[in-house]
Amino acid sequence: MKKILPAVLLGAATLMAASALAQTVTNPPAKPPTAAKPAATTTARPAGRPAPHPTIQPRRSVFVPAAPIIELDEAPVVADLPTVLDTENRDRYRRIFQAQAAGQWAEASAEIAKIQDKTLMGYVGAQRLLSQGYPARYDELAAWLQEYNDHPDAPAIYRLALARRTPGGPELTPASFVGFTAGSPSFAAARTVRGADAPQAAELRTRLQHMADDGGFNAAFVLLDRKSTVDTLGPQEVELWRGRIRTRALEADSQRGVQVPVEIGLPPDANWTAAMAAFTRGNMAEAARRFELVADAPPDRASSWTLSAGSFWAARANLLAGNPQKFAPYLKRAALHGTTFYGLVAQQALGMKIAPDWKVPELDRRRSDQLRGDRTGRRALALLQLGATTAAERELYAGSIDADPQYVEAVLGLAQKAALPGLSVRVGNANWDQRHRIAGFEGAMYPIPPWQPAGGFTVDRALVYGFMRQESAFNPKARSVVGAMGLMQLMPATARVVMSRYAPDQAGGNPWDPSTNMALGQAYLSVLLGGVDDNLVRTAAGYNGGPGNVMKWDATLNAGQDPLLYIASIPLHETRDFVQRVLANYWLYQVRLGQPTPSLDQIAAHEWPRYTAQDTTQGTRR
């Protein structure tokens, strides 16, 4: 049975002594003693990781801390995971969290006095300090931050402390915790949790995105030139936004038929847009030059997905431009990026064997001890003992950023053993730049999830996994900004229609439940596949962009019967990227499951890729 505990996951260096904790909230103690840190120290991660100090303070009169929720028993506890708490301390922490969630401070205080292992005391204190029923003072908050600035609740405690800061009070230790990020890998890498400026950063990103979508390019550049924008987002993210805005401006010019002169200094995305415009006009020489600029972009300015796309299309454009000597070299360069869409297509076209190393790091004794000896890893192991998997994943993800490869391997091994595929993918993405130094990286990036659809699979596992990996990164609690739910990111209206028309056996089911969500998702996939003659490109595009948009693109895109040109011409960035990533996921999961990849053969031969059921023991598509 789930026990939901509101608060910023519990935590406290400012916990009061047992007798003081027994006092009522209306009569708080004068000054709480500091709880001791666990004996373990962090050796896997670089010491003293800098934390940016916020420059914008929230308004005191309106600040309310956004307290996360910790759930105990939200997942079965895996019996043979490494542990750090004995049974007595584990059960005592459970009672403390439950008592504090109910505002039973005296009962919680009595249990706190008996705690021997201090591993989760940071969580206990944060639960109290962030409770709406507890008037935390500035000195308490400052003391907690001094002990636990690396804690997941540190950003919320920091913001609350800023709002309650008094003249002459102790200096605050900035929060150093780096949490989950959203967006493309390049934008995610540029972002950190910046404490007080996080709301301002989110507002700026929303404004910039609206300007890009509405054609307000000049206004966007003016906003990016402001010092306050650079202070809030940081110079790296500002440069990424400049590239994105310039690309959108060039796209608008291309759609109006304006030819943009070749510039070496253009961002790769901008050259890509101009190259595709030249290709569709039939100017293969210009297209080849542009695609070569994309392929030759330095790795710090372009992802492996961009580089492989530039190389693949440079090969194709050069062949059509009468430069056959450049075809094979650029195609081989595309194939170097083995898990990308164009990398896989290039490998297939060259007749190369697609054989990633699927072995995942084993959680042996050495790696278990490494986690126990790390401050973050120790907290995560204790949380897993309580069944608090979401909180544990936050800790492990944060601890793996910029970590030693051996520590990352330990986290990936734990994710595999604890059946946490979402953690595995997120940790892998966070360590993409050092992937060649991490054993079992490819296997960790494409985990086999532990869930099954209610009633079993009616669509191949590889395709369902491919959509899940892209839609939610295997996070069953994922919710998009527009309300899409769960593993398959179903919109509420879509879930209702699918449940009533195509999956009546799921009537009354909870769409957040993994098995129900997967059942509804695969039923929707089956409907989409049936509507486009099993065309995988149009199915993926319809799942993300909507079937109506697919019908419009079929009528307006100048792609003929060229599936690769069709994909590259999809006007919505998100949908274009989605199609490529889902298909790449699908093919890689087929390889991992020991299945052939007929749709990859088809697209490499410039034919439309079509779904062919291969999980014969799992049934066939409805």
Put a short name on every predicted segment:
Residues L21-N89, P170-A201, H210-D214, T232, ...:
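Compositionally biased, proline/threonine/alanine/serine-rich low-complexity intrinsically disordered stretches
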Residues A99, Q132, R165, M211, ...:
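Residue at a conserved register position within TPR or TPR-like alpha-solenoid repeats
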Residues R90-Q104, R194, A198-A219, R248, ...:
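Alpha-helical segment of the N-proximal tetratricopeptide repeat
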